């Protein structure tokens, strides 16, 4: 996929925006930015949120995992989203376990916020010339911490 994207981007004019549809995996977004892509959209944050997967800067978390059963902390302490500022990971796990519709909504909200923060960090790293370092550091931590 990387080779196809790189080839396709080489055919596009530099002065026009470049858009990748359906790209939501953080590694793919970072690769796309490195190739010159400007815009992305994908259902991944909400689809994964509906299924109990939370994106964090330390990797994916499966909120149904028993280790969250009595956790009083939010899904991600550094996140300022409504979910993380009002609900514990243990409560979210409870919502998923009883089939309460609020759980998927709250986790989707967190995931959307994660991707907004992620894209903001990418933009900042591009503007200050540290994108390659940001990408390497992010990938090292995110995929090492993947706990799905």
Regions from the PLM with identified roles:
Residues 76-148:
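C-terminal extensions of enzymes
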Residues 1-75:
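Glycine-rich phosphate/ribose-binding loops and adjacent secondary-structure elements
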């Amino acid at each position: 996929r990387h080779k196809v994207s790189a080839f396709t981007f080489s055919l596009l004019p530099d002065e026009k925006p470049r858009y990748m549809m359906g790209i939501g995996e953080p590694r793919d977004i970072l690769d796309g930015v490195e190739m010159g892509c400007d815009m992305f959209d994908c259902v991944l944050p909400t689809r994964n949120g509906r299924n109990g997967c939370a994106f964090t800067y330390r990797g994916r978390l499966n909120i149904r995992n028993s280790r969250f059963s009595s956790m009083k902390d939010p899904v991600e302490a550094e996140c300022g989203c409504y979910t993380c500022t009002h609900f514990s990971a243990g409560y979210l796990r409870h919502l998923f376990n009883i089939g309460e519709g609020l759980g998927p909504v709250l986790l989707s909200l967190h995931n959307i916020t994660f991707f907004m923060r992620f894209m903001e960090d990418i933009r900042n790293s591009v503007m200050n010339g540290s994108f390659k370092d940001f990408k390497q550091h992010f990938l090292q931590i995110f995929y090492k911490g993947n706990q799905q």
